[in-house]
Design a protein with these regions (language model features):
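C-terminal cap of thioredoxin/glutaredoxin-like
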Residues: 135, 139, 143, 159, ...
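N-terminal targeting/tethering segments
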Residues: 22-132, 208, 220
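Structural alpha/beta surface segment adjacent to cysteine/selenocysteine redox centers
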Residues: 189-271, 276
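Thiolate-centered catalytic microenvironments shared by cysteine-dependent enzyme domains
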Residues: 162-167, 217
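Core regions of peptidyl-prolyl cis-trans isomerase
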Residues: 41, 76, 129-156, 234, ...
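Acidic/polar surface patches and capping/hinge elements
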Residues: 103-126, 140-164
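Extracellular/periplasmic catalytic domains that process cell-envelope and extracellular macromolecules
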Residues: 29, 126, 180-184, 211-212, ...
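Short, low-structural-confidence N-terminal segments
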Residues: 1-62, 68-69, 151, 155, ...
C-alpha cells in the first residue's frame, strides 16, 4: 500500500538562479504558447521561466501537493463508499457501527476520570466536569476507532497515486560528493548546518542508506549555516579546509559525530585526522574557504530554503529530518522509476 507521500515545499526565489528545472511531468507540452499579453507584447511560459524559474517551479509544486492530497483523500472516500455499499448503509452509519462495535460500553474507572481531570488543570470542581470528561473520552474513543478502521481499509487496498512531482536539476559543481558510482540512478543532495540538531540526527540514516545502497546512490552536501547558529559558518569553512587536504568527508563525519564546534575543537579535529595542522589553521583563521561556504549559502537563499536539513532526491524536494524508513521509501521509488533494482541489503 502506498501511504500519503512526503509533500515537498519549495518557496519563491530571488532572481539569483543556480538551478535548472526539468518539470515537464506537470508542465504543458510546450512552454512556447502565449499565456500573457501586456500592452500588445505576447509572453510565454518560457519567458516566465527565464525571469522567475523558482516561482514557476513553486507554482507547479504547489499544484502537485494539492493534487496528491486530493487524490489521497479521494482514495479514502472511495474505499469507504464501496464498503458502505456492500453493507447497505451510509458511510456515516458504517463508521458509527464499527466504532460502536469496538469501543468499550462501560465507563472508565473513577480513578481514570480523576487522573484525566488532574491533567486538564481546570479550576472547576471535579463533579462539575465529570459529565463533560466522560463525553470527551467517549468521543475520543469513537474517533480513534473510526480512524483505525479507515487505516485498516487502506492497508488492505492497493493505492497508487500516479501524479508526478516537478523536479529540479541541482548542479553539483564545486560540491563535495561521495558514494559516486558510474551512472548511479539516485542522487541525494542535502543542504545542512553542522550545528543543526536535526542534521546531526539524520546522519546515521544517511550513513545506513549509503551502506545498503552502495553503488546506487550518490550523496552531495551543501552548506546552509543558519544565522542562529554561531559556530556553523566556521565549522563549514573547516570542512572545506580539510577538503583542501583531501579529507572533506572524514572531517564532515567527525563534526556531526562530536557536535563540538568551537574554533579550538575544529583545530584539534584536524590534528586527529593527521592533517597538516599549520596549513589547516592558516586556512581557517584567514577565512580562505569563507567564499565557498557563502556561495552554497547564497544558492540556498536563492531558493529561500528556510530550514535544515533540506533534501533534493533526484530533484524532488523534501524538508526536515527524514527517518531511515522514509529515506529508503523515497530512494526505492526513485530506483523503481529508473528501472534499477533495489539492493538485497536494503530489502526488508
Amino acid at each position: 500500500m502506498m501511504t500519503k507521500p512526503f509533500l515537498p515545499l519549495l518557496l519563491f526565489s530571488s532572481s539569483f538562479c543556480l538551478l535548472a528545472f526539468d518539470d515537464t511531468s506537470t508542465a504543458p507540452s510546450s512552454n512556447n504558447g502565449v499565456v500573457l499579453e501586456v500592452d500588445g507584447t505576447k509572453l510565454t511560459l518560457a519567458d516566465l521561466e527565464q525571469k522567475h524559474p523558482f516561482g514557476l517551479f513553486q507554482a507547479r509544486n504547489a499544484f502537485y501537493q494539492a493534487e496528491t492530497r486530493a487524490l489521497d483523500e479521494f482514495a479514502t472516500e472511495y474505499l469507504l463508499e464501496q464498503q458502505a455499499q456492500k453493507e447497505h448503509v451510509t458511510v456515516e452509519e458504517l463508521l458509527e457501527r464499527h466504532a460502536n462495535s469496538v469501543v468499550p460500553k462501560g465507563e472508565p474507572s473513577e480513578e481514570a476520570l480523576r487522573l484525566y481531570y488532574e491533567g486538564i488543570e481546570s479550576k472547576e470542581p471535579f463533579e462539575a466536569m465529570r459529565a463533560g470528561i466522560l463525553e470527551h473520552i467517549r468521543q475520543s474513543r469513537m474517533l480513534k476507532a473510526k480512524t483505525e478502521y479507515v487505516q485498516t481499509l487502506r492497508s488492505k487496498a492497493h493505492i497508487a497515486v500516479s501524479a508526478a512531482p516537478p523536479r529540479a536539476a541541482v548542479s553539483l559543481k564545486d560540491t563535495p560528493v561521495r558514494g559516486v558510482a558510474a551512472n548511479a540512478p539516485v542522487t541525494v543532495v542535502e543542504y545542512a548546518d553542522y550545528e543543526c540538531p536535526y542534521c546531526q540526527q539524520v546522519q546515521p540514516a544517511l550513513d545506513k542508506l549509503e551502506t545498503e545502497y552502495k553503488g546506487k546512490v550518490t550523496f552531495a552536501y551543501k552548506d546552509l549555516p543558519l544565522p542562529m547558529h554561531p559556530h556553523a559558518q566556521k565549522a563549514a569553512e573547516a570542512a572545506h579546509c580539510a577538503g583542501a587536504q583531501g579529507k572533506y568527508w572524514e572531517y564532515h563525519d567527525m563534526l556531526l559525530a562530536t557536535k563540538k564546534l568551537e574554533i579550538s575543537q575544529l583545530k584539534e579535529d584536524a590534528g586527529a585526522l593527521k592533517l597538516d595542522t599549520k596549513a589547516f589553521d592558516k586556512c581557517l583563521d584567514s577565512g580562505e574557504q569563507a567564499e565557498a561556504v557563502k556561495a552554497q549559502n547564497a544558492e540556498a537563499q536563492s531558493l529561500q530554503l528556510q530550514g535544515t536539513p533540506s533534501f533534493f532526491i533526484n530533484g524532488q524536494f523534501f524538508s526536515g529530518g527524514l527517518t531511515y524508513e522514509q529515506l529508503r521509501g523515497i530512494v526505492d521509488e526513485a530506483l523503481k522509476a529508473s528501472s534499477a533494482p533495489v539492493p538485497e541489503a536494503a530489502k526488508r
